[in-house]
Amino acid sequence: TYLKLADAPWTFLLESVQGGEKWGRYSIIGLPSRERIEVRGFTVRHIVDGEQQGASEVEDPLAWIERFQSRFKVPDLDDQPRFDGGLVGYFGYDTIRYIEPKLRTALAAEKPDPIGVPDILLMVCDDLVVFDNLSGRLQLWTHADPETPHAYDNAVERLETLELKLRSATFNTLSPGTGR
């Protein structure tokens, strides 16, 4: 299923666990994200469909992320996993500089970055495949912004496309030596 739907950049697989030892009820595939946030130092970049929408020097990147996230409202649904999409990614080790004032200036000095990864990288996850390992059910989820024209129709179209891909008998195979 992952290879059929998520064989692309900006995807992920989350497995739930109970007590750190038992297989959990849900497995969640995050499908290719169109939108992401990258933070390097105190510069926040907002990227949509691979194009930078803006870059801002900010005093507090965590506050910027919190404001960005506040625009998303998703209802709580009974008997569904608590995770329903939103921001997925990582906060790197040096994120502490945004929290601890004593480290702000000490870490602000430019340090070598041999691997070139952002301090924070978050994908906006709109489309999900949710496996309920208890019931054996698979669900396709998508988010639609009611403020966006034709959002509902676009969401239905995305879900129908995902269903067709799932029903197809073929999937992309990983090519040895190419990393894909």
What is each of the regions a protein language model found here?
Residues 60-81:
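FAD-binding glycine-rich core of flavoenzymes that anchor FAD
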